Curated annotation (Swiss-Prot):
Family annotation (InterPro entries): EF-Ts_dimer_sf, Transl_elong_EFTs/EF1B, Transl_elong_EFTs/EF1B_dimer, Transl_elong_Ts_CS, UBA-like_sf
Gene3D superfamilies, alphabetized: 1.10.286.20, DNA helicase RuvA subunit, C-terminal domain, Elongation factor Ts, dimerisation domain
This protein's name: Elongation factor Ts
Membership in a protein family: Belongs to the EF-Ts family.
The organism's taxonomic lineage, starting at the top: Bacteria, Pseudomonadati, Pseudomonadota, Gammaproteobacteria, Enterobacterales
Gene name linked to the record: tsf
Length: 283
């Protein structure tokens, strides 16, 4: 068998744009013949997938699945809403979800490695970059989920709650975007950052520092309530807080996860003229 040198792998990477491991694998299969490796990569769609890999995948789906006291939430991205609704893309995402819950896989890199060949083939077929972005799990006595279309997904774990209550809590979390369960759960880092912001605002009003600090204390209590689930007004009955709702049912929320498609991903905005110009350069 021919020796697969680093320089050979480097050359194939430069010519195809594919990843190092993909290039090495292709060269091994082609017994060191770089032209055959390129031909095989073209047939498999690896080159097309590599070219699409640089495209921003900020659309896609959020999926959830519960098995008893264990739940999984997954985000799989594509580039457009059109592909997010494609049957092939959705089937791929659901297959990844099934594998994640069956194997209790919460390491996204493990899922990526497991489904890389299928992902590459789908990219070649659909013509958009596809990315298994993130996965997380939750466990608890009672689990509930809610999906707002395929763009927002929530998992909730609770004690002493029935299925209807956890469903309502999941819907609340989807709408109100809490970051923590209780006000006391808000991290010291988040509290300190907000405290400094509020103190600067109060000081700019010309108040003495002692008065400004007292003003900020009140604002901070309001802030920790706003960013925590139990401190928020319940969306289905704003006359009571989520904490009051839980007390009425003698229930407690032990955790939740909320995913929204593309959050934290910077989309590339391209105007029509620029898009036409870009296409003309490719032709």
């Amino acid at each position: 068998m021919a020796e697969i040198t680093a320089s050979l792998v480097k050359e194939l990477r430069e010519r195809t744009g594919a990843g190092m491991m993909d290039c090495k694998k292709a060269l091994v299969e082609a017994n060191g013949d770089i032209e055959l490796a390129i031909e095989n990569m073209r047939k498999s769609g690896a080159i097309k997938a590599a070219k699409k890999a640089g495209n921003v995948a900020a659309d896609g789906v959020i999926l959830t699945k519960i098995d008893g006291t264990y739940g999984i939430i997954l985000e799989v991205n594509c580039q457009t809403d059109f592909v997010a609704k494609d049957g092939g893309f959705q089937a791929f995402a659901n297959k990844v979800l099934d594998a994640a819950i069956a194997g209790k896989i919460t390491d996204v890199d493990v899922l990526k490695a497991q489904f890389e060949e299928e992902r590459v083939a789908l990219v070649a077929k659909i013509g958009e970059n596809i990315n298994i972005r993130r996965v997380a799990s939750i466990e608890g006595d009672v689990l509930g989920s809610y999906q707002h279309g395929a763009r927002i997904g929530v998992l909730v774990a609770a004690k002493g709650a029935d299925e209807e209550l956890v469903k309502q809590l999941a819907m609340h979390i989807a709408a109100s975007k809490p970051e923590f369960v209780k006000p006391e759960d808000v991290s010291a880092e988040v509290v300190e950052k907000e405290y400094q912001v509020q103190l600067d605002i109060a000081m700019q009003s010309g108040k003495p520092k002692e008065i400004a600090e007292k003003m900020v204390e009140g604002r901070m209590k309001k802030f920790t309530g706003e960013v925590s689930l139990t401190g928020q007004p319940f969306v289905m009955d704003p006359t009571k807080s989520v904490a009051q709702l839980l007390k009425e049912h003698n229930a407690d929320v032990t955790g939740f996860i909320r995913f929204e498609v593309g959050e934290g991903i910077e989309k590339v905005e391209t105007d029509f003229a620029a898009e036409v110009a870009a296409m003309s350069k490719q032709s």
